[in-house]
């Protein structure tokens, strides 16, 4: 089974569970994880904005709430330029429902990430690549 087939199988079986939580609840489903891109830095957002995002995410699911800053995609300005002008990328604002679900999943993952025993390779812009084997 290829990785893509495995992900499709997991997503079709556990479609309501973010894959990070599926790994925690069902550690036998994954042999390893590669985590790319940092989690949303909730500390940089005011408590009022977080509350508003949660409220909007439950009341007005399709309300536009914010855009991804292209400079956060890469440090390489050539890649940022390509991202900005790629016609296949949706550059519209993020919907409140999606943002709310990402915040919920992020908070859950932050609480349990140290308890996940699956080997993982983590990479983020702020850190060097590190391999966590538990």
Curated annotation (Swiss-Prot):
Transmembrane regions listed in the UniProt entry: none
Highest taxon above the source species: Viruses
Pfam families given in the database record: Hydrolase_4 (PF12146)
Similarity comment: family membership: Belongs to the poxviridae K5 protein family.
Name of the protein in question: Protein K5
Naturally occurring in which organism (per UniProt): Vaccinia virus (strain Western Reserve)
């Amino acid at each position: 089974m290829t990785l893509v087939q495995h992900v499709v199988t997991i997503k079709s079986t556990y479609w309501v569970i973010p894959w990070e939580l599926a790994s925690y609840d069902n550690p036998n489903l994954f042999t390893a994880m590669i985590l790319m891109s940092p989690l949303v830095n909730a500390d940089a957002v005011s408590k009022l904005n977080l509350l508003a995002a949660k409220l909007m995410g439950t009341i007005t699911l399709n309300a536009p709430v914010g855009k991804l800053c292209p400079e956060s995609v890469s440090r390489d300005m050539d890649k940022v330029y390509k991202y900005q002008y790629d016609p296949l990328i949706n550059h519209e604002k993020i919907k409140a429902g999606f943002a709310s679900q990402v915040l919920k999943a992020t908070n859950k993952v932050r609480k349990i990430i140290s308890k996940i025993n699956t080997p993982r390779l983590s990479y983020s812009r702020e850190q060097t690549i590190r391999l966590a084997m538990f």
